[in-house]
């Protein structure tokens, strides 16, 4: 049995050293489940390189992607939300505003201003979903209306990029009236023969969908964006039926005539420029 003997007895190993991986280095795609180097997603315009899932982006990033470099001028940056009704649920509305401002992004759920898209002058409003879910309150409605009015006075196209959970409940009727206010302003833009292009991104829901977001001369959408009024879960609970596969996604809306075209983020600027060239004459 000597052949079972070892010439060198096993040595006790020291404790294993774990390699510390920085947080956020890798991202697991919420769509395909692949683990991807985060920088690869960021370098791909926040789109998964494996399955083409379009992640949400900030309003500032969206402006960078759509407008010519250095052409953007922001308007109405000083208009901020006020707690008119002294609304309080689990916390006060003012506390929610302060919490959103502390994130260091936008001062409200939208940024508006003027810029150029491949040389064409435009008025543009871009929602920021990170600010209270992109909800539309009196400030959002006012800034959109002013943007439309500037497009009227300057005779330029108007573009609105939506990403919103709908009307801001903390402002009650003051938020709901923004639906009529923005729609009335767009009616004047149409009477003047100036184009309005609505870009629908994930998610576009509630009072935003039920007003200006679906009133575009051209309604564009990003792939697989959630677009609807009530959410699919609420609808299923109400009608007590299972909804069709892909219901309320941009592809479903395209098939049913609610969206004119679906455009990937990387092609959005060039496609938008082509549309403006056809619809707008300075």
From Swiss-Prot:
Q: Per the annotation, how and in what number is the cofactor bound?
A: Binds 1 zinc ion per subunit.
- Single GO MF descriptor: zinc ion binding
| Residues involved in Zn(2+) binding | 29, 32, 48, 51
The stretches annotated as zinc fingers (C4-type) lie at 29-51
Give the UniProt keywords, A-Z. Answer: ATP-binding, Cytoplasm, Fatty acid biosynthesis, Fatty acid metabolism, Lipid biosynthesis, Lipid metabolism, Metal-binding, Nucleotide-binding, Transferase, Zinc, Zinc-finger
Q: Which Gene3D superfamilies match?
A: 2-enoyl-CoA Hydratase, Chain A, domain 1
The family annotation for this protein states:
Belongs to the AccD/PCCB family.
Protein's name in the database: Acetyl-coenzyme A carboxylase carboxyl transferase subunit beta
Assembly and interaction partners: Acetyl-CoA carboxylase is a heterohexamer composed of biotin carboxyl carrier protein (AccB), biotin carboxylase (AccC) and two subunits each of ACCase subunit alpha (AccA) and ACCase subunit beta (AccD).
Which pathway, per its entry?
A: Lipid metabolism; malonyl-CoA biosynthesis; malonyl-CoA from acetyl-CoA: step 1/1
Substrates-to-products reaction catalysed? N(6)-carboxybiotinyl-L-lysyl-[protein] + acetyl-CoA = N(6)-biotinyl-L-lysyl-[protein] + malonyl-CoA
Gene from which the chain derives: accD
Query: What NCBIfam families has UniProt attached to this entry?
Result: accD
Q: Which GO terms describe its cellular component?
A: acetate CoA-transferase complex
Essential cofactor(s): Zn(2+)
> Which residues belong to any copy of the CoA carboxyltransferase N-terminal domain?
25-282
Q: Which Pfam families match?
A: Carboxyl_trans, Zn_ribbon_ACC
Q: Which SUPFAM superfamilies match?
A: ClpP/crotonase
Q: Where in the cell is it found?
A: Cytoplasm
State its role: Component of the acetyl coenzyme A carboxylase (ACC) complex. Biotin carboxylase (BC) catalyzes the carboxylation of biotin on its carrier protein (BCCP) and then the CO(2) group is transferred by the transcarboxylase to acetyl-CoA to form malonyl-CoA.
A biological-process GO annotation: malonyl-CoA biosynthetic process
Uppermost EC category? transferase
EC annotation from Swiss-Prot or TrEMBL: 2.1.3.15
